[in-house]
């Protein structure tokens, strides 16, 4: 009765506050060690959550690096986080300590889309047997279906022709290039996963791309981070569907495509694509409870490959065309090299890359300047490690700040400017820099890197072979500042394509 009347509430409230503060202190205990990385003082319960701009993480990390150094700590709720900055520290973390930093932290927000036991995809899977199994399968299967080979090169070149035809239809008129670039790159991934291409005007195709674009921004910001810190909130009925509608819709589309694919799959015939190869592995794994080959994991692996192999490449190409209209002198030099090495009739080939140092340098500089994955995906320590003299305990979430490497002022001559000469020596020969790390490094380096390199070179050279690009007449010069939503995309802009 006292409790109901309110007279017993004060002792309970005091007890609850003391309990929460004790739990909070327990989670802070590692900060008391002398060799733990410095960082801003966390607030009770929330930690540094409100002291970091989650909508502009690269800038927040830049300011914190300037204040606390290349290795600093944060407390996100009760989760300890260490951010690693600069070439030397990131190399030490991902390469020297690679075996002990290849794990992933738990991210409860992904459980709502089917991540669970033996179903964690490949990108976010914990470091262990399941990850190795799926990584090995993905790399070998992509290689078998042409990644790095002439067969896929021809497919990319053919898709580039479709892209150029679509641009020809819009020649001279202002357009946002991202949509067309996204369609072209998606068709390359679709050829590997589903052995098919989509017509650019297909309404279902347009819907898939729209949903995928929307879903990419659902994973960043304050609310997803709060849900990761306090996953009990995900038990609120309907909350996940409201917070992550794009991801759930996209995965439903993936399920429908897989269901259609199963109707025509013949296990007695060689696999047509990655989906067939995965279905064959599911058949082999029947009766093996330890296998990660199952229907639930198929949808997640396909989702990972779309994200890793499509969105990043199309955004990079969108940056490339933006930088060409902002730097017409660079565009002219690339076209001059294309004319000298390839001409205007023959299709570009990967073999041409070795003879085109300036074009190669421009593509690399686009990747460095665009910096589209500034914060990388989080890692986790599987045991106590030491980085740059600081002790980082087992179980700590790690954020390798790739932006701090690609814009490292101690490494690059003009880190904040678009400067292709970063990748050229005094004689004009192409040189690759050790600080060029857009695909990350170590055991968790992007598995789609070989495919991305092929697509970037072939699409970029095909486009500049056929067209000149410029800012539309009467429109202001577009900005080269990016918009952060986990990936760093260029601010929306328009260009005009003119046939050469």
UniProtKB/Swiss-Prot annotation:
Looking at its record, which EC class is this enzyme? Answer: oxidoreductase
Which keywords belong to this entry?
Endoplasmic reticulum, Heme, Iron, Membrane, Metal-binding, Microsome, Monooxygenase, Oxidoreductase
**Record localization:** Endoplasmic reticulum membrane; Microsome membrane
Gene3D superfamilies, alphabetized: Cytochrome P450
- CC terms in the record's Gene Ontology section: cytoplasm; endoplasmic reticulum membrane; intracellular membrane-bounded organelle
Q: Which residues bind heme?
A: 446
Topology relative to the membrane: Peripheral membrane protein
Q: Name one Pfam family in it.
A: p450
Q: Which reaction does it catalyse?
A: an organic molecule + reduced [NADPH--hemoprotein reductase] + O2 = an alcohol + oxidized [NADPH--hemoprotein reductase] + H2O + H(+)
Q: Which InterPro entries match?
A: Cyt_P450, Cyt_P450_CS, Cyt_P450_E_grp-I, Cyt_P450_E_grp-I_CYP2D-like, Cyt_P450_sf, Cytochrome_P450_fam2
In short, the EC number is 1.14.14.1
Q: Which GO terms describe its biological process?
A: arachidonate metabolic process; liver development; xenobiotic metabolic process
Does the record's keyword annotation contain Endoplasmic reticulum?
yes
Top-level taxonomic group:
Eukaryota
Q: Which GO terms describe its molecular function?
A: heme binding; iron ion binding; monooxygenase activity; oxidoreductase activity, acting on paired donors, with incorporation or reduction of molecular oxygen, reduced flavin or flavoprotein as one donor, and incorporation of one atom of oxygen
CDD domains, alphabetically? CYP2D
- Tell me what turns on expression of this protein: P450 can be induced to high levels in liver and other tissues by various foreign compounds, including drugs, pesticides, and carcinogens.
Cofactor requirements of the protein: heme
Q: Looking at the keywords, is Repeat present?
A: no
Free-text function comment from the UniProt entry: Cytochromes P450 are a group of heme-thiolate monooxygenases. In liver microsomes, this enzyme is involved in an NADPH-dependent electron transport pathway. It oxidizes a variety of structurally unrelated compounds, including steroids, fatty acids, and xenobiotics.
Q: What family does this belong to?
A: Belongs to the cytochrome P450 family.
Entries under PANTHER family matching the protein: CYTOCHROME P450 2D26 (PTHR24300:SF109), CYTOCHROME P450 508A4-RELATED (PTHR24300)
Q: What is this protein called?
A: Cytochrome P450 2D3
């Amino acid at each position: 009765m006292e409790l109901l009347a309110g007279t017993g509430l004060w002792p309970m409230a005091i007890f609850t506050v003391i309990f929460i503060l004790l739990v909070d202190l327990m989670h802070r205990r590692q900060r008391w060690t002398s060799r733990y990385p410095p960082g801003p003082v966390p607030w009770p319960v929330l930690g540094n959550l409100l002291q970091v701009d989650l909508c502009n993480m690269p800038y927040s990390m830049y300011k914190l690096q300037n204040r606390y150094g290349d290795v600093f700590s944060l407390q996100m709720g009760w989760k300890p986080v260490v951010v690693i900055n600069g070439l030397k520290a990131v190399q030490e973390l991902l390469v020297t300590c690679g075996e002990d930093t290849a794990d992933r932290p738990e991210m409860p927000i992904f459980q709502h889309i089917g991540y669970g036991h033996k179903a964690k995809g490949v990108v976010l899977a914990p470091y262990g047997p399941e990850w190795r199994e799926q990584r090995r399968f993905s790399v070998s299967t992509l290689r078998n279906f042409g990644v790095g080979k002439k067969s896929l090169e021809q497919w990319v070149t053919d898709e580039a022709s479709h892209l150029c035809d679509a641009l020809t239809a819009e020649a001279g008129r202002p357009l946002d290039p991202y949509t067309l670039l996204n369609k072209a790159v998606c068709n390359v991934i679709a050829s590997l996963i589903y052995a098919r291409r989509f017509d650019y005007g297909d309404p279902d195709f347009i819907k898939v791309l729209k949903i995928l674009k929307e879903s990419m921004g659902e994973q960043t910001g304050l609310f997803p981070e709060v849900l990761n810190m306090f996953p009990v909130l995900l038990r609120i009925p309907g909350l996940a569907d409201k917070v992550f509608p794009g991801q759930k819709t996209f995965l439903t589309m993936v399920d429908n495509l897989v269901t259609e694919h199963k109707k025509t799959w013949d296990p007695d015939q060689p696999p047509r694509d990655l989906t067939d190869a995965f279905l064959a592995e599911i058949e082999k794994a029947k009766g093996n409870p330890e296998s990660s080959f199952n229907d639930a994991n198929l949808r997640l692996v396909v989702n990972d490959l779309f994200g890793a192999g499509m969105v990043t490449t199309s955004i990079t190409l969108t940056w490339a065309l933006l930088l060409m209209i902002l730097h017409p002198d660079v565009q002219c030099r690339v076209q001059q090299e294309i004319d000298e090495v390839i001409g205007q009739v023959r299709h570009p080939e990967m073999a041409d890359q070795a003879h085109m140092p300036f074009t190669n340098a421009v593509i690399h500089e686009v990747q460095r300047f665009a910096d589209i994955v500034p914060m990388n995906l989080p890692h986790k320590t599987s045991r106590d490690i030491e980085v740059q003299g600081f002790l980082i305990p087992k179980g700590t979430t790690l954020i390798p700040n790739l932006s701090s490497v690609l814009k490292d002022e101690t490494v690059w001559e003009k880190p904040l400017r678009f400067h292709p000469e970063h990748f050229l020596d005094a004689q004009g020969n192409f040189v690759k820099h050790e600080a060029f790390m857009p695909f990350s490094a170590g055991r968790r380096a992007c598995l789609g890197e070989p495919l991305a390199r092929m697509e970037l070179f072939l699409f970029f050279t095909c486009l500049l072979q056929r067209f000149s690009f410029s800012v539309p007449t009467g429109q202001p010069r577009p900005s080269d500042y990016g918009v952060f939503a986990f990936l760093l995309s260029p601010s929306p802009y328009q260009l005009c394509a003119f046939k050469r």
